[in-house]
């Protein structure tokens, strides 16, 4: 047996304090503050029949032996506000209640049936909520056993009833003539089952005459604070019969208790008549064969009675709140003896009680009774109400226990099933095997909460709450706090989505003590940070249920190892996810990165070789600081594997970042100025621990990066998805494909593949990049001719190394070489004389390519088909940007296919042709009347070049579509034949050698070049050199 305080929260959790040291044989000590009385009038039971509330419900098991509510009077010296811990004003919140119940736990060694026979319906010592059960037959006791049972009530169960006192002639559960107890050591301690002895002078006050006790009002103090009530005598007798069997012979008849009629005034000690109502109590025959036999250690009777008797006066003086609204209560004279205890609250489960002992045999219950209103009679018919606040979502019913009992049973059973202690004691065995400094009582406090809406709710006057003592205040610092955090972290990870997690058991607020001490740690599942919220579902899955992080700082090494292994093996992750997990700024990500880099062995490698190996395993993506963190982890691992290669880890990190920048400068697009070795050496001066890096090392690294650029992996899954979309004949969604992270201006960027598009032409081509976007100069090392096999599929010209195969998927490099031909124009390169059968292809972003065909016919076929496809599917352009400046800007050309029909497309192209011709005339007329200089003249030249090119392009589109419509066929072979037959004059088709952007008369020029106007027409582009 042990003593402590437990608080029940509204979510169903509880917290129990370490046991208090009982004051042995010190009746003169201070009386502790009495608990509030709102729980005394309620009932509760620990039942095993149903599952506990909540999403993780399971069958509840037996936890404790029968226990008895411990009740006591309020201390006349201490009377703080009952709501002091939670309300600064001392007033209770509206509709809120706070209940404290003190229980006594006894572990039974063995159970014997009543009088050698099992009790009918099983013995279930419970009072459930909801009504009054019919009285059960109780065996009568002879006169010889009355004295012993009364002494047992004083020693074994010192629980005085709520206002009831023992009087001669009381009719109720105890039968037989009254006998005056013998106050002696032999007479008292001979009845104790464990043979405990103690001073007898403190027990003399237990048996006083009935005239010393009167019926008092609320707030009064007992006139005789040391009397043994009839309720305590019945409890003692029931316990004696429960543990040791009945003293009556088995043949003794049992008759149900009867309600004692009110005694007329003047009977006994001359006081007024009262109401004596018998109550029935059923006791549980539980299966405790596995419990070893133990002696029962008892506490000092004087101490217990002194602490509890004053509370009974306040409880007895309260008006009863258990009666039904509207129930007629006959008035009774105020001065009168309490002839009987409060009638028992029925369980409301008559069907279960009459069904036999199949369910009741496993029930272990506790009960809390309420003192009856003085001088009032409560009928046995009709359900009674209890001030016990119901937990949310639960209500008492005839098919299951009340919410208080169900939640309490679930808490104790769950902690016992986990093999942990729900108190600061070592295990549950300590409850039944107390030490010499432990008390046999537990205090459980229910938090104030608004009750469920009920008609005419009773309003009992609350008593002062129980002040937490030293054992209660140190509950959060007990040895079970850390274990409880781990269990709560596990429970929080397994919590069903959409459900609120239960409140922590070890919260200081559950005791009403305010803020937690500085030394205690908050529960893990209540701390959420930005870094923890960044974890996606895959990372949480890798962490497991017990690897919850707190503010990104409490990392679990085992979880980091599991996640790093899965990232390296790409088990449930993509390559694009690896850098995102390694680049976070928290301790867990650092652990994951350290474990991930352990899979790489860079021993004996140079820095550039190790960097190439590392970048092939992940796609280095994300923001600059995220990528820098990933490179920092790589540098740390490289220095661990090669401690002698560089002077420090910081030096390795500096060189790694320098190589990344050098790779961009040497191989990136649109870089006006490249770095050389001298500039690299100048940039790295003094960054090697205050010194310079060896020149030979920098020279080797520079040569390696210049000869072979760094390649890192792209998202293969996204690449496969894009290829599958190209091969899917019936797509539902068209997604924009992004190019690899290594080329900033790849032709494959911003392409919208057309799944299921028709293949219009394929054949061998030789390509040369003549100008980058906006007609910028292409670097000299990227201008060479390369052989490809061209595939015109939809609005995209794919260039692949191998010959075209219809069922073969395209590779990454082939996708990067693709060119979109929306708003493009192909013309014969008559000005280029180095190679035969060459034609130009200018794209919408003003890139220029040179293509060489195997023959003249193939060149004409490629030019015609590219222009026809562009004319068929190019959508009308968007308006140009509007600005307060007069700077010229080209309109936006959409890459999506048009939704117009071919007739409407022809009319659109013709309208744009007329508009461009009219605008060109106006622009030239403006130039003749106004001589511009400087930037204005440059802008006028750019606009004129643009208008000339657009007029030629729309004229070509309109002419080709008119020929196609006149041919009346969708086959491009027929269109080619019609174009060749027209000769380019009848329908206004421009000659194949003409080019609106590249001058046709270039005999004096050795090679093709952009004109000055075209070079200036590129937005911000530089001028081409002749």
UniProtKB/Swiss-Prot annotation:
<feature type="coiled-coil region">
    <location>
        <begin position="900"/>
        <end position="926"/>
    </location>
</feature>
<feature type="region of interest" description="Disordered">
    <location>
        <begin position="978"/>
        <end position="1026"/>
    </location>
</feature>
<feature type="modified residue" description="Phosphoserine">
    <location>
        <position position="722"/>
    </location>
</feature>
<feature type="domain" description="PH">
    <location>
        <begin position="758"/>
        <end position="871"/>
    </location>
</feature>
<dbReference type="InterPro" id="IPR000904">
    <property type="entry name" value="Sec7_dom"/>
</dbReference>
<dbReference type="InterPro" id="IPR011993">
    <property type="entry name" value="PH-like_dom_sf"/>
</dbReference>
<feature type="region of interest" description="Disordered">
    <location>
        <begin position="25"/>
        <end position="97"/>
    </location>
</feature>
<feature type="modified residue" description="Phosphoserine">
    <location>
        <position position="156"/>
    </location>
</feature>
<keyword id="KW-0966">Cell projection</keyword>
<comment type="similarity">
    <text>Belongs to the PSD family.</text>
</comment>
<dbReference type="GO" id="GO:0005085">
    <property type="term" value="F:guanyl-nucleotide exchange factor activity"/>
</dbReference>
<feature type="compositionally biased region" description="Pro residues">
    <location>
        <begin position="447"/>
        <end position="465"/>
    </location>
</feature>
<comment type="subunit">
    <text>Interacts with ACTN1.</text>
</comment>
<feature type="compositionally biased region" description="Pro residues">
    <location>
        <begin position="328"/>
        <end position="340"/>
    </location>
</feature>
<keyword id="KW-0344">Guanine-nucleotide releasing factor</keyword>
<protein>
    <recommendedName>
        <fullName>PH and SEC7 domain-containing protein 1</fullName>
    </recommendedName>
</protein>
<feature type="region of interest" description="Disordered">
    <location>
        <begin position="246"/>
        <end position="403"/>
    </location>
</feature>
<keyword id="KW-0472">Membrane</keyword>
<keyword id="KW-0175">Coiled coil</keyword>
<dbReference type="InterPro" id="IPR001849">
    <property type="entry name" value="PH_domain"/>
</dbReference>
<feature type="domain" description="SEC7">
    <location>
        <begin position="514"/>
        <end position="708"/>
    </location>
</feature>
<dbReference type="GO" id="GO:0032154">
    <property type="term" value="C:cleavage furrow"/>
</dbReference>
<feature type="compositionally biased region" description="Low complexity">
    <location>
        <begin position="168"/>
        <end position="184"/>
    </location>
</feature>
<dbReference type="GO" id="GO:0032012">
    <property type="term" value="P:regulation of ARF protein signal transduction"/>
</dbReference>
<feature type="region of interest" description="Disordered">
    <location>
        <begin position="436"/>
        <end position="538"/>
    </location>
</feature>
<keyword id="KW-0597">Phosphoprotein</keyword>
<feature type="compositionally biased region" description="Acidic residues">
    <location>
        <begin position="300"/>
        <end position="313"/>
    </location>
</feature>
<feature type="region of interest" description="Disordered">
    <location>
        <begin position="924"/>
        <end position="943"/>
    </location>
</feature>
<dbReference type="GO" id="GO:0005543">
    <property type="term" value="F:phospholipid binding"/>
</dbReference>
<dbReference type="GO" id="GO:0032587">
    <property type="term" value="C:ruffle membrane"/>
</dbReference>
<dbReference type="InterPro" id="IPR035999">
    <property type="entry name" value="Sec7_dom_sf"/>
</dbReference>
<feature type="modified residue" description="Phosphoserine">
    <location>
        <position position="126"/>
    </location>
</feature>
<dbReference type="Pfam" id="PF01369">
    <property type="entry name" value="Sec7"/>
</dbReference>
<feature type="compositionally biased region" description="Polar residues">
    <location>
        <begin position="1000"/>
        <end position="1012"/>
    </location>
</feature>
<feature type="region of interest" description="Disordered">
    <location>
        <begin position="126"/>
        <end position="196"/>
    </location>
</feature>
<comment type="function">
    <text>Guanine nucleotide exchange factor for ARF6. Induces cytoskeletal remodeling.</text>
</comment>
<dbReference type="InterPro" id="IPR041681">
    <property type="entry name" value="PH_9"/>
</dbReference>
<dbReference type="InterPro" id="IPR001605">
    <property type="entry name" value="PH_dom-spectrin-type"/>
</dbReference>
<feature type="compositionally biased region" description="Acidic residues">
    <location>
        <begin position="349"/>
        <end position="367"/>
    </location>
</feature>
<keyword id="KW-1003">Cell membrane</keyword>
<feature type="compositionally biased region" description="Pro residues">
    <location>
        <begin position="71"/>
        <end position="95"/>
    </location>
</feature>
<dbReference type="InterPro" id="IPR023394">
    <property type="entry name" value="Sec7_C_sf"/>
</dbReference>
């Amino acid at each position: 047996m042990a003593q402590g305080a437990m608080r029940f929260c509204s979510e169903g959790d509880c917290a129990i304090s370490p046991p208090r040291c009982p004051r042995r044989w010190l009746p003169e000590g201070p009386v502790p503050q009495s608990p509030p009385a709102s729980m005394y009038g309620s009932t509760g039971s620990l039942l095993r029949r149903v599952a506990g509330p909540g999403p993780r419900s399971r069958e509840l098991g037996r936890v404790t032996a029968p226990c008895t509510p411990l009740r006591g009077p309020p201390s006349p010296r201490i009377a703080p506000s009952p709501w002091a811990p939670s309300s600064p004003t001392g007033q209770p919140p509206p509709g809120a209640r706070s209940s404290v119940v003190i229980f006594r736990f006894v572990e039974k060694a063995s159970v014997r049936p009543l009088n050698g026979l099992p009790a009918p319906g099983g013995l279930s010592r419970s009072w459930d909520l909801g009504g009054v059960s019919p009285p059960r037959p109780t065996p009568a006791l002879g006169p010889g056993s009355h004295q012993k049972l009364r002494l047992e009530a004083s020693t074994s169960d010192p629980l005085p009833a709520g206002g009831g006192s023992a009087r001669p002639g009381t009719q109720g559960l105890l039968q037989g003539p009254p006998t005056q107890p013998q106050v002696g050591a032999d007479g008292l301690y001979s009845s104790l089952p464990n043979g405990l002895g103690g001073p007898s002078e403190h027990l003399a006050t237990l048996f006083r005459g009935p005239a010393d006790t009167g019926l008092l009002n609320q707030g009064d103090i007992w006139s005789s604070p040391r009397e043994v009530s009839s309720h305590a005598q019945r409890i003692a007798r029931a316990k004696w019969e429960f543990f040791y069997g009945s003293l009556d012979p088995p043949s003794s008849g049992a008759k149900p208790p009867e309600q004692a009629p009110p005694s007329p005034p003047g009977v006994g000690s001359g006081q007024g008549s009262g109401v004596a109502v018998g109550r029935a109590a059923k006791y549980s025959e539980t299966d405790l064969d596995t419990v070893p036999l133990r002696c029962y250690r008892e506490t000092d009777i004087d101490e217990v009675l002194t602490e509890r008797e004053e509370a009974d006066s306040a409880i007895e003086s309260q008006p009863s709140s258990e009666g039904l609204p509207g129930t007629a209560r006959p008035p009774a004279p105020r001065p009168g003896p309490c002839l009987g205890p409060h009638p028992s609250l029925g369980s409301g489960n008559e069907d279960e009680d009459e069904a036999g002992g199949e369910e009741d045999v496993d029930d272990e219950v506790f009960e809390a009774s309420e003192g009856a209103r003085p001088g009032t009679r409560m009928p046995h018919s009709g359900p009674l109400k209890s001030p016990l606040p119901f937990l949310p979502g639960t209500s008492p019913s005839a098919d299951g226990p009340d919410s208080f009992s169900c939640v309490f049973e679930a808490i104790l059973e769950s902690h016992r099933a986990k093999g942990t202690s729900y108190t600061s004691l070592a295990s549950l065995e300590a409850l039944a095997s107390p030490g010499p400094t432990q008390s046999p009582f537990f205090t459980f406090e229910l938090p104030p909460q608004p009750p469920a809406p009920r008609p005419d709710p009773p309003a009992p006057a609350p008593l002062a709450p129980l002040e937490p003592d030293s054992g209660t205040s140190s509950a959060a610092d007990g040895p079970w706090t850390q274990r409880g955090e781990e269990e709560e972290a596990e429970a929080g990870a397994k919590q069903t989505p959409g459900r609120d997690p239960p409140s922590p058991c070890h919260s200081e607020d559950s005791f009403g003590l305010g803020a937690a001490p500085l030394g205690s740690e908050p529960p893990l599942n209540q701390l959420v940070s930005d870094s923890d919220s960044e974890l996606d579902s895959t990372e949480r899955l890798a962490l497991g249920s017990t690897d919850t992080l707190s503010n990104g700082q409490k990392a679990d090494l085992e979880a980091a190892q599991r996640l790093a292994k899965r990232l390296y093996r790409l088990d449930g992750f993509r390559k694009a996810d690896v850098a995102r997990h390694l680049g976070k700024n928290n301790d867990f990500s650092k652990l994951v990165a350290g474990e991930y880099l352990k899979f790489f062995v860079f021993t004996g490698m140079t820095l550039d070789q190790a960097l190439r190996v590392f970048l092939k395993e992940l796609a280095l993506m994300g923001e600059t600081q995220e990528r820098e963190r990933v490179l920092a982890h790589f540098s740390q691992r490289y220095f661990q594997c090669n401690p002698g290669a560089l002077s420090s880890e910081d030096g390795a990190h500096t060189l790694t970042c320098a190589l990344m920048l050098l790779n961009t400068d040497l191989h990136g697009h649109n870089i006006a100025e490249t770095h050389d070795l001298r500039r690299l050496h100048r940039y790295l001066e003094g960054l090697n621990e205050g010194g310079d890096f060896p020149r030979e090392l920098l020279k080797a690294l520079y040569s390696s990066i210049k000869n072979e650029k760094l390649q890192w992996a792209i998202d293969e899954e996204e690449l496969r998805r894009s290829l599958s979309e190209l091969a899917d004949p019936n797509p539902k969604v068209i997604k924009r494909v992004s190019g690899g992270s290594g080329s900033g201006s790849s032709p494959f960027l911003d392409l919208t593949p057309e799944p299921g598009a028709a293949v219009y032409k394929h054949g061998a081509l030789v390509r040369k990049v003549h100008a980058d976007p906006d007609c910028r100069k292409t670097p000299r090392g990227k201008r060479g001719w390369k052989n490809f096999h061209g595939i015109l599929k939809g609005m995209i010209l794919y260039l692949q190394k191998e010959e075209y195969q219809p069922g073969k998927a395209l590779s990454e490099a082939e996708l990067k070489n693709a060119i979109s031909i929306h708003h493009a124009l192909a013309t014969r390169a008559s000005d280029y004389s180095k190679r035969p059968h060459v034609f130009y292809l200018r794209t919408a972003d003003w890139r220029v390519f040179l293509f060489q065909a195997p023959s003249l016919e193939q060149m004409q076929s490629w030019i015609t088909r590219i222009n026809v496809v562009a004319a068929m599917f190019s959508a009308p352009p968007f308006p140009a940007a509007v600005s307060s400046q007069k700077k010229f800007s080209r309109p936006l050309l959409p890459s999506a296919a048009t939704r117009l029909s071919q007739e409407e497309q022809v009319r659109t192209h013709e309208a744009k042709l007329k508009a461009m011709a009219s605008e060109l005339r106006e622009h030239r007329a403006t130039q003749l009347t106004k001589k511009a200089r400087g930037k204005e003249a440059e802008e006028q030249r750019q606009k004129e070049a643009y208008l000339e090119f657009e007029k030629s392009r729309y004229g070509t589109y309109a002419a080709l579509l008119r020929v196609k419509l006149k041919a009346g066929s969708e086959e491009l072979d027929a269109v080619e034949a019609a174009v060749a037959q027209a000769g380019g004059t009848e329908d206004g088709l421009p000659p194949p050698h003409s080019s609106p952007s590249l001058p046709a008369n270039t005999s004096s020029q050795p090679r093709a070049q952009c004109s000055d106007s075209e070079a200036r027409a590129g937005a911000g582009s530089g001028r081409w050199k002749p």
